[in-house]
């Protein structure tokens, strides 16, 4: 159903602080790790933080948060704490980075699956597909969905790079100061033939369901706790909403926020 709201109905959505913080911290670490290993110093990351902050202050998603002075200060401090957490779990000079923000794709019958890998690294066993999460650490049993998403990228690497990553890995950077050990913050799962087959089959099934939904106009709903964070919940039929109102109401909601932020209306 979320696919329908985003790509069929084209209902615009609003950013939230967690989303923007995640994008910002990714950008800081992208700038840092793009440097030569010996140049990934504390002075460098401070400079990269300033560069990213300058970029984000001009971005619509940051401006649409409408942060007051106190909330803005809290936002930047939460970003700094995520970067500090990164340094508590990894010395950046030791990271063997293969690619950052690399586009990969793979054909699946008549469909194509593609996306950007945030961080592709190499250790003594081979490639690892990695990502950062700026939320609090979750144990392996509760990180399944995140790791599954990364396994799709491992599948794409197998096709495009002719090398299958041996693991997928999440670096959790949220959750406060010194409250979590490195083992809690770095969660790794092996990539196996079974996990690759599982995501391949799932992708084909989902693509088939999307095509069927496009033809019939009917998209299945999947009610979970994540619905509470969905920007389209108020219009979702599973929650008593009216899809017919979504585009006009969503467009007006975003237009109002843009006016409040002093941004020009989108054509």
Residue locations for each model-derived region?
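Charged, glycine-rich intrinsically disordered N-terminal tails and low-complexity linkers that flank
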Residues: 1-31, 267
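Metal-dependent nuclease catalytic regions and adjoining charged, substrate-binding loops involved
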Residues: 157-267
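Mg2+/Mn2+-dependent nuclease catalytic core
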Residues: 98, 102-199
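A non-catalytic, helix-rich entry segment at domain boundaries
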Residues: 28-100, 107
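Short, polar/flexible loop-turn hinges at active-site or ligand-entry regions and domain interfaces
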Residues: 9-18, 35-40, 139-142, 217-219
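Glycine- and acidic
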Residues: 6-13, 64-65, 132-139
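Conserved phosphate/pyrophosphate-binding and hydrolysis machinery centered on Walker-type P-loop NTPases
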Residues: 14-22, 65-76, 220
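Hydrophobic (often cysteine-bearing) scaffold residues that line and stabilize catalytic clefts
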Residues: 17, 21, 25, 75, ...
